[in-house]
Amino acid sequence: MADDHPQDKAERERIFKRFDANGDGKISAAELGEALKTLGSITPDEVKHMMAEIDTDGDGFISFQEFTDFGRANRGLLKDVAKIF
């Protein structure tokens, strides 16, 4: 799939970096859980479910590519998250 508007990519990068608390280039379940607490109450099961959905290669982390693919498939959700972060 062709890349989006450069502004969309920059927005995804900005959000990804906010979720990637330790700056290692990937989002762990713990980082995802901490970031999502900002959005409200979230259970460990909800974090596990989201990881399973977004972590398509099953390595236990969300790469920027996986985050991008999820963002493209869920543009409305990502825009809502962008307003908060």
Swiss-Prot record:
The keyword Calcium applies. Transmembrane segments: none annotated. Keywords: Allergen, Calcium, Metal-binding, Repeat. Ca(2+) 2 binds at D55, D57, D59, E66. PROSITE patterns: EF_HAND_1, EF_HAND_2. Coiled coil: none annotated. Residues 7-42, 42-77 form the EF-hand domain. InterPro entries: EF-hand-dom_pair, EF_Hand_1_Ca_BS, EF_hand_dom, EF_hand_pair_protein_CML-like. Ca(2+) 1 binds at D20, N22, D24, K26, E31. It comes from the Eukaryota. GO terms for molecular function: calcium ion binding. Monomer. This is Polcalcin Bet v 4. The gene is BETV4.
